[in-house]
Swiss-Prot record:
It catalyses: (4R,5S)-dethiobiotin + (sulfur carrier)-SH + 2 reduced [2Fe-2S]-[ferredoxin] + 2 S-adenosyl-L-methionine = (sulfur carrier)-H + biotin + 2 5'-deoxyadenosine + 2 L-methionine + 2 oxidized [2Fe-2S]-[ferredoxin]. GO terms for molecular function: 2 iron, 2 sulfur cluster binding; 4 iron, 4 sulfur cluster binding; biotin synthase activity; iron ion binding. This is Biotin synthase. [4Fe-4S] cluster binds at C81, C85, C88. Belongs to the radical SAM superfamily. Biotin synthase family. Its cofactor is [4Fe-4S] cluster; [2Fe-2S] cluster. The gene is bioB. The lineage of its organism: Bacteria, Bacillati, Actinomycetota, Actinomycetes, Mycobacteriales. Homodimer.
Length: 345
């Protein structure tokens, strides 16, 4: 399922414009850009941004089509996580204002109902944990059963790192898609997390795929990684070949080690969106957390016209998102149909 090669190709030389190469290689040939080629895209001057976004949109339309998948997420267990992901206000190791809390099953079902009413076809149950214990898995199982009895929607989960037995349990529950983000390039990961390894995350994703669930894996841009590491990350995702890549942009949270980092410039964020589309021409590329503070309304529109073909509507885990109505109105204005439930199965 690899869409891009990490090795240099004959087309990465400086004698030909990278967008001309991408038009031939990606748009016409369906082969994602390599790591070195993605780096060339990320280094394009700002006056090439409109051309880059237009090409990324063409690639998305050709290889993914016009439909946009809409997803809602809910936090089943918030805060108190033992891991030290430096961007995350849910870590119990930092002095952030987020406190540990659990959601009950009726509230979970109501959230799923509201998500389905928005036109979403995917509802993701998230927990702030290193990995699920028996109590949490039992709660997830009960929640999935209760949702299925009342709501027609695909159910995804994001519960941290899994054992082989837990992967099988989730598959048997009928989980449609499992999210576990690599977060950043392998070479930069130790700057972001020290309580577990990038390889441990990769192992979970491999087991999820082997069990027949869809793989959702992306990360957060703007955590201090270099452009070279951002290109490395795109190539690593292409090697993994996930069904979906959520792109988050760092929204610095008070009390976390990354709380004082600056927000990524909008032009840099849009170049990154387009570059990831050119590396992953057939993959669902989802706007996720941080887009509001990074891009605003105009930037969100440019992103959807620059390679994005999926969105999270409503709020995120610990930060506010755009109202679902705003995103749905934008998609309607752009004449982009929502992906139906049957098409997402």
């Amino acid at each position: 399922m690899t869409q891009a090669a990490t090795r240099p190709t004959a087309e990465t030389g400086n004698d030909e414009d990278i967008l001309a190469v991408a038009r031939r290689q990606v748009l016409e040939g369906g082969q994602g850009l390599s790591r070195d080629q993605v780096l060339q895209v990320l280094r394009l001057p700002d006056d090439r941004l409109d051309d880059l976004l237009a090409l990324a949109h063409e690639v998305r339309m050709r290889w993914c089509g016009p439909e946009v998948e809409v997803e809602g997420i809910i936090s089943l267990k918030t805060g108190g996580c033992p891991e030290d992901c430096h961007f995350c206000s849910q870590s119990g190791l930092f002095a952030s204002p987020v406190r540990s809390a659990r959601l009950d099953i009726p509230s979970l079902v109501e959230a799923a109902k509201q998500t389905a009413k928005s036109g979403a076809t995917e509802f993701c149950i998230v927990a702030a944990v290193r990995g699920p214990d028996e109590r949490l898995l039992a709660q997830v199982a009960a929640g999935i059963e209760a949702i299925r009895n009342e709501v027609e929607i695909n159910i995804a989960c994001s519960l941290g790192m899994l054992t082989a037995e837990q992967v099988e349990q989730l598959a048997e529950m009928g989980v449609h898609r499992y999210n576990h983000n690599l977060e950043t390039a392998r070479s930069f990961f130790p700057n972001v997390v020290t309580t577990h390894t990038w390889e441990e995350r990769w192992d979970t994703l491999s087991m999820v795929r082997d069990a027949g669930m869809e793989v959702c894996c992306g990360g957060i841009l703007g955590m201090g990684e270099t452009l070279e590491q951002r290109a490395e990350f795109a190539a690593e995702l292409a090697e993994l070949g996930p069904d979906e890549v959520p792109l988050n942009f760092l929204n610095p949270r008070p009390g976390t080690p990354f709380g004082d980092l600056e927000v990524m410039p909008a032009t840099e964020a849009l170049k990154s969106v387009a570059a990831f589309r050119l590396a992953l021409p057939r993959t669902m590329l989802r706007f996720a957390g941080g887009r509001e503070i990074t891009l605003g309304d105009l930037g969100a529109k440019k992103g959807i016209l620059g390679g994005i073909n999926a969105v999270i509507v409503g709020n995120y885990l610990t930060t506010l998102g755009r109202p679902a109505e705003s995103d749905l109105e934008l998609l309607d204005d752009l004449q982009m149909p929502l992906k139906g439930l049957n098409a997402s199965l």
